[in-house]
Curated annotation (Swiss-Prot):
Its cofactor is Mn(2+). Signal peptide: none annotated. The keyword Hydrolase does not apply. The lineage of its organism: Eukaryota, Viridiplantae, Chlorophyta, Mamiellophyceae, Mamiellales. This is RNA-splicing ligase RtcB homolog. It is an enzyme of class 6 (ligase). Catalytic subunit of the tRNA-splicing ligase complex that acts by directly joining spliced tRNA halves to mature-sized tRNAs by incorporating the precursor-derived splice junction phosphate into the mature tRNA as a canonical 3',5'-phosphodiester. May act as an RNA ligase with broad substrate specificity, and may function toward other RNAs. Mn(2+) 2 binds at residues 130, 267, 361. Ligation probably proceeds through 3 nucleotidyl transfer steps, with 2',3'-cyclic phosphate termini being hydrolyzed to 3'-P termini in a step that precedes 3'-P activation with GMP. In the first nucleotidyl transfer step, RTCB reacts with GTP to form a covalent RTCB-histidine-GMP intermediate with release of PPi; in the second step, the GMP moiety is transferred to the RNA 3'-P; in the third step, the 5'-OH from the opposite RNA strand attacks the activated 3'-P to form a 3',5'-phosphodiester bond and release GMP. It comes from Micromonas commoda (strain RCC299 / NOUM17 / CCMP2709) (Picoplanktonic green alga). The active site is at residue 436. One of its GO terms (biological process) is tRNA splicing, via endonucleolytic cleavage and ligation. HAMAP family: RtcB_euk. Coiled coil: none annotated.
Amino acid sequence: MGVMDLPGGRRTYAQEMEFLERVTPTQWRVREGFVPNMRVPGVFYVNKHLETLMFDELRQHVDRGDVGGFLPAVKQLANVACLPGIVSKSIALPDVHSGYGFAIGNVAAFDMSDPNAVVSPGGVGFDINCGVRVVRTNLHERDVTDIKEKLAQSLFDHIPVGVGSQGIIPTSPAGLEAALEMGMDWSLREGYAWAEDKEHCEEYGRMLNADPNKVSARAKKRGLPQMGTLGAGNHYAEIQVVDEIFDKHAADKMGIERLGQVMVMIHSGSRGLGHQVATDALTEMERAMARDGILVNDRQLACAKISSPEGQNYLSAMSCAANYAWVNRSSMTFLCRQAFAKMFDQTPDDLDMHVVYDVSHNIAKIEEHVVDGELKTLLVHRKGSTRAFPPHHPLIPVDYQYTGQPVLIGGTMGTCSYILTGTEKGMEETFGSTCHGAGRARSRNNSRNKLDYTEVLEKLKTKGIAIRVASPKLVMEEAPESYKDVTEVVNTCHDAGISKKAVKLRPIAVVKG
């Protein structure tokens, strides 16, 4: 390594770049040594345009020194490569951006047979099972064009939105306990879901190792009033139309038959309950690290051995939060079906309002993967990334056995969204994972300071998009200018072969917290 010319033995930008090498037009490798103690290399997927954002962030970090803010995503990716039990590589997808501990858009898998392998709440995120569901209809854009303002208002009236929004799905503390344990089975039992909804949901809407006793009283207290609510931030319910079909066979299997077909996309997570589960676990894990002598490069990467009581407790509590998020999306699907039924004076069944699929973007799951020719049981952390299993995988629904698992990619407010399908190459390269959305390009703070919410709302109106927002001043944080271009992200994954484009959706109405 060349001479260090920055104070404190820090490397220059050029010296940092010596550790990064392009492997293919869409893939870079981070060599061991980029940060101390790397056990495996890092890999990140970017195209020419997205790599500029990645490297600018690194350059700013070098210029600024280790002062304030999150580390750049590429450093976070490398720090994850130092965790005990990590297998093969630490992976970042094209929508990657800095997060707490792990970057958002980071995938890492840990060997369940290694007694030192860890689980890290930072590798799942605070909004456990933040995810997306798409519901189809048999309506055409022309059926809703004249009434989209009314339809947006109807959705806004039906679905509780915003930061402190409270649910209208009645439940008691005992009901919450059951929902945490049962996930969508609870929704089905209570009449808020159709039996076939479960078939088209990752994990069939229920993590089986959920144990409500591992969820703190404080988390339950936060979760009880928020069941069936949308929340704020980047969460939304959007009425969309099919804009382009890239893979007719896959689209047909999803019940997507024509351009202009009306769809509904719901993006939400586990609200305050999931946040509290993560916070509680981080406190416990800091103690476990001291006890077990686990050292990490960044204290935000607090973790515990998977086999330890803290590791097991977290996985049980995380599963409860995941179940809660599926109940949440099911409740909102129920409310959304009601809103459409009222507006069109037809039953949701007559409107063909079936769930196409429901995916999680923030979760850790035990899966089997082939590593170096050997089948291994791994704990796969996906934070800001989506499971994308290939055709014929046993864990995807019968309907999608020939197409691969549908992967739902939400755009930013007012931009297009995509439905992709999983591929065999993704299974080999990224533990069956792909991107989850656009990925932030500006911090929330920067967006608030640089953008004007009235302008952002005006722009959406000029695009012909009906919008209902509970907290208008939070809109700047979610403006398209705050994010990377979702099409660039999706195309990078498509070109890399880790997922395949099937359908493009365009928004006509947005409901936001």
